Amino acid sequence: MKLDLKKLKLREVNEKLQNLDRKQNDRNFTITNPEGNHAVCAGLTEEMNINIKGHVGYYCAGMNQKAQIIIDGNVGTGVAENMMSGKVHVKGNASQSAGATAHGGLLIIDGNASSRCGISMKGIDIVVKGSVGHMSGFMSQSGNMVVCGDAGEALGDSLYETNIYIRGKVKSLGADCVEKKMDKNHIKKLNLLLKEANIKNYKAESFKRYGSARKLYNFKIDNVSSY
């Protein structure tokens, strides 16, 4: 089913997707003329396939559950924020805070992601085929972040148990973030994520893993300058 945002209001489109017609049971949608609208496809809770033809604004696919969403363009701040499950695939670049606070699902970004990618992530898997900006992975708690390019300043600042895999250069590490060894389980998981993102030209062994040194979990006066 085609949903044209030049003919329909954003509220009408989101309401239709949030309340699927059980009799018609159409679960394949194409959204045209998004023209930078904010909160497109926010709050979806059921299995469906959506293709957004164009650029979108803030919080696209926020709070997503189960839906498979492809964006043929760039996205603004907070794509897939607080996502619970499903898959969001950005064919272009992403602005700041991509995948922020998300608990699950898979976010794929074909281009670059700006600052704070994966901030406070809580279980989502994020794959960025380009590079990420500063403070990416800040206070991230669990899940995996894969970056095929470079990472900006303060990567993984104050993170908990997220695994961050970087293939390129890291400008600097944030507080309590250190390079860690890759074991067989990490390599297996990373190869799986690369496969899911249809990345065939890189192998897991070409990445470095970063994680928490676990020195800031509890307050220690010796570490006060790092808090």
Question: What are these language model-derived features?
Answer:
Residues 1-40, 110, 127-129, 134-135, ...:
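Intrinsically disordered, low-complexity terminal regions
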Residues 19-28, 39-48, 59-67, 78-85, ...:
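Beta-strand repeat architectures
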Residues 32-34, 53-55, 62-63, 72-74, ...:
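Feature marks extracellular polysaccharide-active and adherence modules
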Residues 57, 76-77, 95, 100, ...:
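Leucine-rich repeat
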Residues 88:
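Short Fe-S-cluster ligation motifs
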